């Protein structure tokens, strides 16, 4: 079984790639009229935020949670490494931060994330966004049209 740390250790930080990705994200956002700001606090320690997706799913607010966390990081540029900032974001969507965080740290939630991570690893998924259509992997936002074409074949 592989943990998230194992996956991340394999992906070396390459400064030239990081610089390119920042520029590319800004270009794609501008072209598609998406409100986006590269977060100056990046990289964000996202483990607890990812666990939160499973808690939010149990509460029936997964999509809302994902949208608000995404906006906090990539639109508002908030420091989501700071627990106080995370608490404020959670409160703004009527989530009790204390209870939510406790649930996110439960063994059940940890196991769910670990299971999904292992499933992704076994399928050959290595980054986001990844689309799987008819057992074929399409990686990157620039491959969405290829994935759609494959789906309607």
Task: Please provide the spans of the model-predicted regions.
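Glycine-rich phosphate-binding loop at the start of an alpha helix
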Residues: 1, 46, 114
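Short, small-residue-biased leader/transition segments that mark boundaries at the very start
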Residues: 1-8
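A structure-centric signal for secondary-structure junctions around beta-strands
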Residues: 4, 49, 127-128
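GST-like domain detector, emphasizing the conserved glutathione-binding G-site
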Residues: 9-64, 144-153
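C-terminal cap of thioredoxin/glutaredoxin-like
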Residues: 68-153
């Amino acid at each position: 079984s592989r943990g998230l740390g194992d996956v991340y250790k394999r992906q070396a930080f390459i400064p030239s790639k990081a610089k390119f990705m920042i520029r590319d994200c800004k270009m794609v956002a501008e072209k598609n009229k998406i409100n986006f700001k590269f977060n100056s606090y990046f990289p964000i320690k996202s483990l607890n935020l990812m666990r939160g997706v499973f808690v939010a799913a149990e509460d029936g607010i997964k999509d809302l949670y994902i949208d608000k966390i995404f906006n906090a990081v990539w639109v508002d540029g908030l420091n989501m490494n700071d627990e106080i900032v995370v608490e404020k974001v959670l409160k703004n969507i009527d989530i009790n931060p204390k209870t939510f965080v406790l649930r996110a740290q439960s063994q059940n939630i940890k196991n769910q994330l670990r299971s999904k991570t292992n499933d992704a690893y076994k399928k050959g998924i290595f980054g986001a966004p990844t689309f799987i259509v008819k057992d074929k992997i399409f990686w990157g936002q620039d491959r969405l049209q290829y994935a759609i074409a494959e789906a309607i074949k």
